[in-house]
């Protein structure tokens, strides 16, 4: 007979491992209990659960890998709420830095260059890195000095102390590029 649900049951048990064990779900026979006043003692699991029930709180397994496992007498609902709140705050504080690319050709007009420069500044103010790329086609490859000149003029304009040149002007194949990044704010 083939058990078709075995994979689903296995997945359910894995997701349950992320939750902390509380009260009768704690498997150890003896646990180190941390009381509300900070005192500790090693007790059989039944006595520890009884102590938690006496003060109308939960026995929560904090460190299951310790010998004996460490449990704390706390209100599990409040504890879980504070953990989720802390994780939400950490996610909010994380900033994902994206790499934005601004492309141009070596025969770019001054007005177009001004427009591209405004885009570059906007991306940098948002906190993104900017890759400025110049594509050369055909005979333009003989005049790479024009590309270096354009990149230098952009760097002079950006020259603010809030931005840093992460990668100097390089030539790869038919493209020339440099990367400008905002300084990290710590």
Swiss-Prot record:
Signal sequence residues: none
One Gene Ontology cellular component annotation held by this UniProt entry: cytosol
GO biological process: ribosome disassembly
Region Disordered, residue ranges: 1-20
Compartments where located: Cytoplasm
Recorded GO MF terms: ribosome binding; translation initiation factor activity
Superkingdom to which the source organism belongs: Bacteria
Keywords: Cytoplasm, Initiation factor, Protein biosynthesis
Transmembrane helix found in the keyword field: no
InterPro entries registered for this protein in UniProt: T_IF-3_C_sf, T_IF-3_N_sf, Translation_initiation_fac3_CS, Translation_initiation_fac_3, Translation_initiation_fac_3_C, Translation_initiation_fac_3_N
Its biological purpose: IF-3 binds to the 30S ribosomal subunit and shifts the equilibrium between 70S ribosomes and their 50S and 30S subunits in favor of the free subunits, thus enhancing the availability of 30S subunits on which protein synthesis initiation begins.
Subunit structure and binding partners: Monomer.
Family classification: Belongs to the IF-3 family.
UniProt name for this protein: Translation initiation factor IF-3
Organism: Borrelia duttonii (strain Ly)
Gene name of the encoded protein: infC
């Amino acid at each position: 007979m083939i058990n078709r649900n075995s994979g689903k049951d296995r997945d359910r048990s894995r997701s349950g491992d992320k939750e902390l064990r509380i009260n009768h779900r704690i498997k150890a026979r003896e646990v180190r209990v941390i009381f509300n006043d900070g005192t500790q003692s090693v007790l059989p699991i039944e006595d520890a659960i009884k102590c938690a029930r006496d003060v109308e709180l939960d026995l929560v397994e904090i460190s299951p890998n310790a010998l004996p496992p460490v449990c704390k007498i706390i209100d599990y609902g409040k504890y879980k709420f504070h953990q989720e709140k802390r994780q939400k705050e950490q996610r909010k504080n994380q900033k994902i830095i994206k790499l934005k690319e601004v492309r141009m050709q070596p025969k770019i007009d001054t007005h177009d260059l001004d427009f591209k420069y405004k885009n570059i500044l906007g991306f940098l103010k948002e906190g993104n890195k900017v890759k400025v790329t110049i594509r050369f086609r055909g005979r333009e490859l003989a005049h790479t000095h024009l590309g270096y000149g354009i990149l230098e003029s952009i760097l002079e304009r950006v020259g603010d102390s809030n931005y840093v040149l992460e990668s100097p002007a390089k030539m790869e194949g038919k493209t020339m590029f440099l990367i400008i990044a905002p300084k990290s704010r710590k």
